[in-house]
Regions:
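Carbohydrate-active catalytic/glycan-binding domains of CAZyme proteins
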Residues: 1-331
Length: 331
């Protein structure tokens, strides 16, 4: 049987209230929120302490936060979504004493003519590197910092047959990176499956991206097989946040799993899960089911001192459909 198109599938299966909003030009707007870690208590257990919103601007809203610690400082990297072009770039700022004030210094550091998101920054081979999501370009791109954090150069761009989303670095060796990424289904929206891939420096400017075929043979498409942030350590365990969608709605919940490189089932050791009803953001409250404004929780990052999440709500956007058509015609 032929797969239903995205539009007709959503029309048939989406919650009626949400469907009406979408047809009336409501669109997702993402909110990044941050809080300091207190007494070692973090999500998914600590659901009571309030997060503080990182305010969006007239030109940008922000999503896909990641945290990178460097020389005693904590840097926040995000997707900066341009409301006019409908394309994301990569922005950053340093977190200090007052995150709500710090983020007013967010500035775009990488911008391409295609959509970018999910910036993953890491130290490797004596340098600082970044792999953002560039699935809109059907590529995987490795950048190197020339003047951290403001100037980056491309090291390599590898064309990919599939659209790869939300790539995380799970292992670093001297000449090779092990990546955990998701292939997006061409038949059903929000359906994806995990790939473990190796990005290898072959020398003399040559790079190779290969699949772990044994790992791939054990993966299935699902609504949960997608990263929601970088690996982090908790109590001697390596943890991975993942995002959960539904048939018709993207990024509604987060799952937390213990990551084991020898385990093909990423979700074999799931330790917790949260939705918008479990998180309080100043000015937004909790999820709509709890009387707040939030519709979904989508990403999570943690450092020694901070936790950062992104959530979304629906906002009336009268030019939504016009801008999407204009973007397709332009690109």
């Amino acid at each position: 049987m032929a797969a239903e198109s995205g539009f007709w599938f959503k029309l048939k299966h989406m919650d009626r209230g949400m469907l009406v909003k979408k047809m009336l030009s409501f669109d997702n707007v993402y909110v990044i929120a941050v809080r300091r870690i207190a007494d070692g208590k973090t999500l998914p257990e600590d659901k009571d302490r309030e997060f503080v919103q990182i305010t969006d601007t007239r030109d940008f809203w922000y999503a896909d936060p990641s945290l990178f610690e460097w020389k005693g400082d904590t840097w926040l990297f995000v997707e900066a979504f341009d409301r006019k072009t409908l394309l994301g770039g990569i922005a950053c700022c340093k977190l200090c004493d007052d995150p709500a004030e710090d983020v007013k210094k967010l500035r775009v550091v990488i911008k391409e003519n295609f959509h970018m998101s999910f910036p993953q920054v890491f130290e490797w081979n004596g340098g600082l590197y970044m792999i953002p999501e560039t699935g809109d370009d059907h590529s995987l791109i490795l950048y190197r910092a020339v003047d951290f954090p403001d100037k980056w150069e491309r090291v390599v761009r590898i064309q990919t047959e599939s659209v790869l989303a939300d790539t995380a670095v799970v292992k670093k060796e001297s000449g090779r990176l092990t990546l955990l990424t998701s292939e997006l289904s061409t038949k059903r929206q929000y359906f994806q499956r995990y790939h473990r891939m190796y990005l290898t420096d072959k020398g003399n400017g040559r790079w190779e991206l290969t699949d772990d075929e044994e790992f791939l043979s054990k993966q299935e498409f699902s609504y949960i097989a997608r990263n929601a942030g970088s690996l982090y350590e908790e109590g001697g365990q390596i943890m991975l946040p993942t995002q959960e969608s539904t048939e018709t709605v993207y990024g509604v919940r987060l799952n937390f799993v213990r990551y084991d490189e020898n385990e093909a089932d990423i979700f074999a050791q799931r330790t917790g899960s949260i939705g918008p009803e479990d998180v309080t953001v100043r000015g937004f409250g909790k999820g709509r089911a709890s009387g707040g404004r939030l519709d979904g929780v989508h990403s999570y990052a943690r450092s020694r001192d901070y936790e950062v999440i992104d959530l979304y709500y629906n906002e009336f956007t009268p030019l939504k459909h016009f801008r999407k058509i204009a973007k397709k015609l332009k690109y």
